[in-house]
Amino acid sequence: MASGSVGEDNALPLLEPSGEESPLPFEWTAPSLPPPDRSRLQAPLSYDPLLAPRSTSALLHLALSRQVDQGELDVERVVEQLSQGLPLESLPRRPLRTVRFGVQVLADLGVGMEPFSRDVHETVHHVRATVGREHTQVAYFDHCPVRGAGPGPRWTWGEYVPPAPGTRILILSDLGMGGPRLDARRSSRAEWERLVRTLAYAQCTAVAFVPFPEQRWPSWAAKLLPLVPWDRHTTAGWVAAHIG
């Protein structure tokens, strides 16, 4: 036999069972729960968007468009100038609202906006449908764009760079009003003031949709940039009266 092998004489004996006992039966002292009553199960709650679906497109167009004097010929002004003997150096035209300068959506993904994440994505979809995908840019950020922003995942974000001059900026954010009170990441007034200065230097105008009522808005925010209450009570008429 080869070296290192175990011979038959050295094999260990097999163990033999001495007996087998079944475990004692266990008796439950509490009655089992009844089966669920299917008739009492509630269907999942339906999704109710913050903006009324019927007025969303009109509301967004008013909030995101710019007014330019490139509409139809203003005949009344022409007649008035000629009647006063004034020369027509240019043909006066009626004001026209347009979105041809493009829109950039800045969407907040911070903890305070988590309850409104579906509304954020739905609003981005409506903006693209209203303005046109070719005229719509989307950048995401966490709490405030000055900390970094980008169109892709968080790890791809970099320093926020404003778009071309004349682009309308739509900010979807709680402006630091939501989330835990002691959250160290909460955005500050100074950060938003820095963003607005950056946009003004780039010749871009901004409007913010805020998912809180006007009573909760800090006074500095309402003075800093136009705010729109992001809820079903906001109408296109309200936007036309408050947003230039």
Task: Set out the residue ranges of the language-model regions.
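Acidic/polar low-complexity segments with low predicted structural confidence
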Residues: M1-V103
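Hydrophobic, Leu/Ile/Phe/Ala-enriched alpha-helical segments that form helix-helix packing faces
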Residues: A63, V79-S83, T123-V131, L195-L199
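…and closely analogous acidic/polar surface helices at protein-protein or active-site interfaces
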Residues: F101, G110-V146, S188, W192
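Conserved acidic
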Residues: D108, D174
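A short, conserved beta-to-alpha structural element at the edge of catalytic cores
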Residues: V127-P151, T198-W217
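Von Willebrand factor
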Residues: H135-L170, G176-G178, E193, F212
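Von Willebrand factor type A / integrin I
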Residues: P165, L175, P180-G244
